[in-house]
Amino acid sequence: MEDAAAPNSGSEFNPGARRGKSIDECQDMIRRSFRNPIVKFLMEQMEKSGCRVGDNFVKAVVCTGPVAGGYTKGRGITVCSNYLTIQDEVNQVVIHELIHAYDECRAKNLDWTNCAHHACSEIRAGHLSGDCHFKRELLRGFIKLRGHEQECIKRRVLKSLRGNPYCSEVAAKDAMEAVWDTCYNDTKPFDRAP
C-alpha cells in the first residue's frame, strides 16, 4: 500500500476518483480533519484509554496501490495523498483508521493475522465511520434502498481481508460471519453508531 510498509488494515479507494493531492496539501487536510467532532472524540477516547496519539500519528504518504489509507500497528495512520481529492474523503479515512487504532488500543491482544480479529475491526470501522452511508454508496454506484448498509460493510470487509495474506477467501467469509453480530453491535467508544 504505502511505499515504506504495508498497513495491517486499509481503507478502500474509490477507483472513479480523480488524481489526488500533494503530500503537503493532504497533510493540511489531515490537520483540518482534527477539527471534525468524530475525529476529536476518537482521539480523546484513545488518550483516555492510555494510547498516545502524537503529532505524527496520522501522516500523508504517496501510496502504490489503489487504497485511501491504512493503519499499521506501532506506526499509526497513513492517508494516501495521491488518491484523495476532497476534505470529506480525508475525514472519512482518518475516522475509519482511528477506529482500527482504537480497537488495538482497547484490545491489547488484537492480532491482525487472525482473520476473526481483522474482520471484527473492519466491521466496526465500516459501521461506525459512516463508510456505508446511503449517499456514499450511491456515489460508488451501488443503489439499494433496503439493507444497503450491512451489505456494503460485508463487501468492504471481504475486500479488506483479501489483502491479508493470512486469510483465504473462505477463511475471511467464515470469520466475518462468525463475528458479525458481536462486532456490528459493538459501538464503543460511541453510545450508538454515529
Swiss-Prot record:
List the keywords (alphabetical): Hydrolase, Membrane, Metal-binding, Metalloprotease, Mitochondrion, Mitochondrion inner membrane, Protease
The main enzyme category here is hydrolase
Q: What is its main location?
A: mitochondrion
**Quick one: a GO biological-process term for this protein?**
proteolysis
Q: How does it sit in the membrane?
A: Peripheral membrane protein
Key word Mitochondrion present: yes
Give yes or no: UniProt keyword tRNA-binding. Answer: no
Q: Where does Zn(2+) bind?
A: H96, H100
Question: Highest taxon of the source?
Answer: Eukaryota
Provide the E.C. number(s) assigned to this enzyme.
3.4.24.-
Q: Cross-referenced InterPro entries, in alphabetical order?
A: Peptidase_M76_ATP23
Region described as Disordered: 1-20
For the null mutant, the annotation states: No visible phenotype.
Q: Which GO terms describe its molecular function?
A: metal ion binding; metalloendopeptidase activity
Intracellular or extracellular location(s): Mitochondrion inner membrane
Q: Which residues form the active site?
A: E97
Instruction: Return the GO cellular component terms, semicolon-separated.
Output: mitochondrial inner membrane; mitochondrion
Q: What does this protein do?
A: Has a dual role in the assembly of mitochondrial ATPase. Acts as a protease that removes the N-terminal 10 residues of mitochondrial ATPase CF(0) subunit 6 (ATP6) at the intermembrane space side. Also involved in the correct assembly of the membrane-embedded ATPase CF(0) particle, probably mediating association of ATP6 with the subunit 9 ring.
PANTHER family found in the cross-reference section: MITOCHONDRIAL INNER MEMBRANE PROTEASE (PTHR21711), MITOCHONDRIAL INNER MEMBRANE PROTEASE ATP23 HOMOLOG (PTHR21711:SF0)
What's this protein's family per the entry? Belongs to the peptidase M76 family.
Q: What is this protein called?
A: Mitochondrial inner membrane protease ATP23
Name the source organism.
Arabidopsis thaliana (Mouse-ear cress)
* Taxonomic lineage of the native organism: Eukaryota, Viridiplantae, Streptophyta, Embryophyta, Tracheophyta
